[in-house]
Amino acid sequence: MYKRQIYTASTVVGVVGVGAAAWPLIDQMNPDASVKALATTEVDVSLVKPGQSITVLWRGKPVFIKRRTENEITEAKAVSLTELKHPEKDEDRASNPEWLVMLGVCTHLGCVPLADKGDYNGWFCPCHGSHYDTSGRIRKGPAPTNLEIPKYEFVNSNTIKIG
C-alpha cells in the first residue's frame, strides 16, 4: 500500500510540474494587449453628412464609412442581382441603409479604391480598373468579389463599433 501512495504522489507532482513548465510556453501564444486593442474601434459619425464618406484605419486596413443619400440607396436597391458579378442584395450589405461600412481594399490585388468615382458612382480602383457601385458591389473589372463588409454595430446613433 505504501508503494502505491508514493507512486500516486509522484505522478501528481510530475503532472503539476509539467503543467507549470508548459503554461508560460502556451500563454506566450496569446495575443498581447496591443493586438487586443486593435480588435475593435469605435468611430464617431455625428459630423458625416449625407453623401459624405470617411476613412478610418482598423487592423491596419482602411475602412470606408459612407453616409448614403436617398438617391444612392434607391439606386443600390434597384440593381437586379442578375447584373452583378458577385450577387448580393444591398440589404445584406448595409444593416442600416443610410450607412455603408466596408473594407477599403480592392478584392483584386489589394489597392485602395477611390470614392465617388467609376462608371457606377461608387468606387473605382485605379490600379486595374475595377468599378464598384454605391453598395460596394463589383460591377466591372477584374475584381472577383464585392468590397468586404467587416463585422460592425451601431453603439448609438452617432457611434459605429467595427470589429
Region spans (language model):
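Conserved small/polar residues in nucleotide/adenosyl-binding loops
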Residues: 1-5
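A generic structural signal for short, solvent-exposed coil/turn residues
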Residues: 7, 35-37, 48, 57, ...
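Hydrophobic membrane-insertion alpha-helices, especially the h-region
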Residues: 9-22
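Aromatic-capped interface at the extracytoplasmic side
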Residues: 21-41
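Intrinsically disordered, low-complexity boundary segments flanking structured domains
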Residues: 27-31, 50-54, 87
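Short beta-strand-initiation
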Residues: 38-40, 49-51, 147-149
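Short extracytoplasmic
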Residues: 42-72
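Rieske [2Fe-2S] iron-sulfur-binding domain
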Residues: 74-163
